[in-house]
Amino acid sequence: MTLQTFKSTDFEVFTVDGLEERMSAIKTNIHPKLEALGEQFAAYLSKQTDENFFYHVAKHARRKVNPPNDTWVAFSTNKRGYKMLPHFQIGLWGTHAFIYFGLIYECPQKVETAHAFLEHLNDLKTNIPNDFVWSIDHTKPSVKLHKTLETEDLQKMIERLATVKKAELLVGIHISPEEFSAMTNEQFLAKIESTMQSLLPLYALCNR
């Protein structure tokens, strides 16, 4: 693995003021790395699942005033988009890098997926690594650490996915800038791979 990934200074892109200025910095410094990660891990996911995965780098095209606070590359089995499907993400906030699997509010499979997750609730509680985190809103950086959740807490988040129209549910890891600076390029790529490996059983539940 010789792919050049993020640097610890890349987190600082989100301190750039102004929409045009920040977008220019993201396109120059971050997007080429997301494209490279996209190519590598779309191929990895395709191999692991025997499905064709495509990558989608966030364009932030709807933003007219406020600059983005995060950016990412997403992976789905649709060449045209990812928001309507269960998908994987690799990205950055100013406070952390993230690697996720999940469903966001546009996905029509939320009810069926929630039911599948609930059928395997105890397995999810046991098998998700303790240092993984859960997010119920991809637009906010706040998360809940898996090891702090009771089974009932996890059940409520999954039930919410089925019953609340705008509900979302994502799970994965956060890596702080400090942790990131101590990692080699190869260690970060290996971390992405191992995280996706841990999340693939959830993807399988979405497609049973």
Curated annotation (Swiss-Prot):
Transmembrane feature ranges: none
InterPro entries: UPF0637 (IPR009403), UPF0637_domain_sf (IPR053707)
Signal sequence bounds: none
Lineage: superkingdom: Bacteria
One Pfam family linked to the record: DUF1054
Family listed: Belongs to the UPF0637 family.
HAMAP family in the cross-refs: UPF0637
Protein name stated in the entry: UPF0637 protein BA_4170/GBAA_4170/BAS3872
Source species: Bacillus anthracis
Origin organism lineage: Bacteria, Bacillati, Bacillota, Bacilli, Bacillales
